[in-house]
Amino acid sequence: MTSALEAIRYKRGHLLIIDQLLLPHVTRFIPIRSAEDGWHSIKEMHVRGAPAIAIVAMLSLAVEMSGLVSQQKISKNAEDTRVYIEEKLDYLATSRPTAVNLSDSVRKMKSVLEQKTRTLTCSGEEIAMSFIAYAENMLVHDVADNRSIGEHGANWIVANTPSGVEDSKLCILTHCNTGSLATAGYGTALGIIRHLHEKSQLCHAYCTETRPYNQGARLTAYELVSDQIPATLITDSMAGQLLAKMGQSIAAIVVGADRVASNGDTANKIGTYTLAVLAKYHGVKFVVAAPRTTIDMGTRTGKDIVIEERPHSEVTTITGPRERGDECGNIVMENIKIAADGINVWNPAFDVTPAALIDAIVTEKGVEVKDANGRFHLGSLFETEVRPSN
């Protein structure tokens, strides 16, 4: 089974992304015609999820470059074209600072462009086409990587949890949105849930609402319902009671990641750290699922990760459709105040879960666990790194 949801629609020169701010009530696609469009779609959270952010950023610039090529507006000079692309990449990298996938993609793309430019016979158009091909390959590779993550993670949970060994079907708790809407397709943590469901090994999935942006309630619940996966939505503050009630009947808490430090400390959606503490207390496995591009070997620990802070209004207001539409039956979206005027607000978008609270980190290459001294060795994941062809 493959998820029917398609959040990114791309063909060369054309990019559409689903507007996640309107989900689950309205399904509408936004055309992305330039790097500037891509930057705004990421910054304003029309698209979110670390893998999807990187892909949309690259494809937005690919669309822009395709237009310049077709209009014959590309400089004939390879170096000029490389500089133009790199300036656009640096601009796109400022849209969301915490998610490492974007900065990692920018770094790798710059390396590819530099190597390509060294070819004396290379033209500006060839540099542009090389970039476009690289961006397109990212889209293809991400889907394949997600399916591998789903399989590796599901198999590890089945083999390493009491309910996995003893029962034929498992219950999983997840946080935020890590599915088709957060990636090129299938998902990371939600990909594990999908794989268990495909193999008839999933009893039930639980998803948190994920305040303040409600990605769990709006997006993960939307995906679970769409794929007919048995699931229940809970508020963030109910997770402790769920674990107290069900104990190790919850096989694992599975989350994604926006940045993983070299020691395994993981930055993810706010509330992840709380779930990890709860998992430790209740003896439930805590699993991080992310592609290798999310692992930042240049960041030593979680203390070095910059945490993005979002607008106060995301906490003090909530947006949704009226229960009844207008006189013609059309959906009417409204922004509602839910907090006292004048109250101070702190709104970090992410928190950092220490590696000590994480049982396993799942990537497309397999499952990483800690050694006898309680340390992850994530560097081994990059010993045979394969980049998308250009």
From Swiss-Prot:
| UniProt xrefs under PANTHER family | METHYLTHIORIBOSE-1-PHOSPHATE ISOMERASE
Q: Which organism is it from?
A: Coccidioides posadasii (strain C735)
Q: What does this protein do?
A: Catalyzes the interconversion of methylthioribose-1-phosphate (MTR-1-P) into methylthioribulose-1-phosphate (MTRu-1-P).
In Swiss-Prot or TrEMBL terms, this protein is called: Methylthioribose-1-phosphate isomerase
Q: Which family is it part of?
A: Belongs to the eIF-2B alpha/beta/delta subunits family. MtnA subfamily.
Q: Name one GO biological process term.
A: L-methionine salvage from methylthioadenosine
What SUPFAM superfamilies does the annotation carry? Answer: NagB/RpiA/CoA transferase-like (SSF100950)
Q: Does the keyword Nucleus apply?
A: yes
Q: What are its E.C. numbers?
A: 5.3.1.23
Its pathway, per UniProt, is: Amino-acid biosynthesis; L-methionine biosynthesis via salvage pathway; L-methionine from S-methyl-5-thio-alpha-D-ribose 1-phosphate: step 1/6
GO MF terms listed in the record are: S-methyl-5-thioribose-1-phosphate isomerase activity
- Give the annotated active site: D258 (proton donor)
Where it sits in the cell: the answer is: Cytoplasm; Nucleus
Reactions it catalyzes: 5-(methylsulfanyl)-alpha-D-ribose 1-phosphate = 5-(methylsulfanyl)-D-ribulose 1-phosphate
Keywords associated with the record:
Amino-acid biosynthesis, Cytoplasm, Isomerase, Methionine biosynthesis, Nucleus
Question: Among the entry's GO cellular component annotations, what is one?
Answer: nucleus
- Spell out the NCBIfam families in the cross-references: eIF-2B_rel, PRK05720.1, salvage_mtnA
Which Pfam families does UniProt cross-reference here? IF-2B
Q: Where is this site: Transition state stabilizer?
A: C176
User: Which InterPro entries did the record assign?
Assistant: IF-2B-related, IF-M1Pi, IF_2B-like_C, Initiation_fac_2B_a/b/d, M1Pi_N, NagB/RpiA_transferase-like
Task: Tell me where on the tree of life, at the top rank, the source sits.
Answer: Eukaryota
